Amino acid sequence: MTMTRRTWLLVPVLAALAACANTSAPSSSTAGAASATPGSTPAVTPFAAAKPPKLIVFMVVDGLPIRQVLGYRDQLQPDGFKRFLDRGAWFANAYYGHGYTVTAAGHSIMLSGAYPERSGIIGNEWRDPMTGAPQYNTADPRYHYIGNKTEPLAGTSPENYKVETVGDVLRTLQPGSKMIGISGKDRGAILPSGHKGTAYMFMGSSGQFASSTYYMDKHPAWVDAFNAGKPADQFFGKTWAPMLPESAYARSVPDGQPWQANSGNGNKLPAVLGAGMDGPGPRFYGNILPSPFGDELTLAFARAAVEGEQLGADDQTDILSVSLSSHDYINHAFGPESRLSHDHFLHLDAYLQDWFKYLDAKVGRDNYVAVLTADHGFTDTPEWAKSQGRDAGRIVPAQAVGFVNAGLARQFGEGRWVIGMSGTGFIFDEPLIQQRGLKQDEVYEAAKALVVQVDGVQTAFTRAQLAGTDTTTPNLAQMRHSWYPGIAAPLQVIPKPGWMFGSRVMGTTHGSPYENDTHVPLLTWGPKWVGQGRIEQRVEIIDLAPTLSAILHVPAPRQAQGKLLPLPAK
């Protein structure tokens, strides 16, 4: 197969081995963090004594907070999530240490061990702070999807990803190893795959899974065969029905609330996919991911990848990353407190049980290590939170920008000083600042003094603060981890806990430095490599990459900022 990807230069092996020694130092955000009860920290697994597994199965559930895993634990299947919770090792206090917790940032961290301050993946999309031009995290106009339409700013390559991953290091040292990334979202497939892997993502226009010409000129036969079967069409007319009796959902918010959005399938169960449509087509395919069937379809493609690529079939370790996107779509529309989210989680658990049974039979229980985490958590829907007596709400971006511009006009003269938002940051009319003979930092500081007066805003940090060394101001270290000079906005704004930017009184989101968004599952299983137990010690998701590298007997990615996870000895 002719490959068209550009060459990705990795450091020489000896340099990488030397860099690996630096990964044992704790990151700045974990140093001094709350630790486990004295005497409860498990011994580090002696990975060097165990032969590397044939396959690493890296699972991501997009938008899954740990509170949902533990809150519904009593309703789980015996061998889905409970495989990790009852027979694996899992971390009760696993956090992201960066402040802007969104999908691309989370996926960029997991297998690189590097924060956005190093990777350059500061968000899903951002605007150039000098020109305001939009940039998507994995957009690259030089490449297109294979056999599918490529929209402007579609994710097609890891060009913007400035670091290497565990898979990149593995494939440099062992070219026969394979690194496959699969997801309902382009960013969920591309970023974990790194620069040397191969990514496949769901195409909402066709119901297919496709790669891009960054990776290959044409799909392998197994991908064509999967798509030829039109597996997405099987869900047309299928009913999403609750898995359990109504009484089992008493702990979650009922369907049909006024703040719950219509994801394309309504906001009540049971829901029939494709209702009111004549047949499968782009509109229908786009409604699959906001349902449990999006995960079912993604896992079906993952099985096809295991078969087609013969993953885990020889002594060259392979890595399969599968990012399941449906939970994020469902939480955005209905909220993590909703029955729809609760029920989707139970469907997902059943899918995982079937998936692991398949891997046990195909690869062998003693031949693979499984890891499951999330790219971020979720904030409860503000309207529901307020009904529970909590402080919560929405900050309308246009109103916040208008308020700040009015204040800056009074101070510096008429002008559209703030031209918009990039993530939760403000970007400015830089030529106007220069024309008026003003210093940038003077304008940024003035804007900060104004924006903190907006209802729902907790604080804001200027470029000078983010480039500084202050380690005492709350949330500053987290936002510094999310800030990349020349890419990120020069004024970063943080809403209060429970608040979010948004102009629609519907649905909810994530993206804050608070526990709801940063506290995620970190679950591991692998009988020959990992012991069992709940670990209380606080850890960060940046610790995953060095740990997986140790299991694989390869150096950690050279930009990794984490340390080895304190996994219990086997």
Residues covered by each model-derived region:
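Non-catalytic, well-ordered alpha-helical segments in soluble enzyme domains
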Residues: K82-D86, V163-T172, G423-F461, P527, ...
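Active-site His/acidic residue clusters
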Residues: I190-A199, L273-G286, P290, Q310-L348, ...
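A long, amphipathic alpha-helix that forms part
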Residues: Q68, I288-D314, H327-Y368, Y444-A446, ...
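Substrate-binding rim/cap in mid-to-C-terminal beta-strand-loop elements of soluble/periplasmic
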Residues: S387, I395-L438, T509-L552, P566-K570
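Active-site nucleophile/metal-coordination loop of metallo-enzymes that catalyze phosphate/sulfate
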Residues: P38-P52, I66-E164, R171, K185-S205
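Bacterial signal peptide processing site
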Residues: A21-T23
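Secreted, luminal/periplasmic, and some membrane-associated catalytic domains
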Residues: V61, N124-G155, V163, S193-H195, ...
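C-terminal motif of bacterial Sec signal peptides marking the signal peptidase cleavage site
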Residues: A16-A19
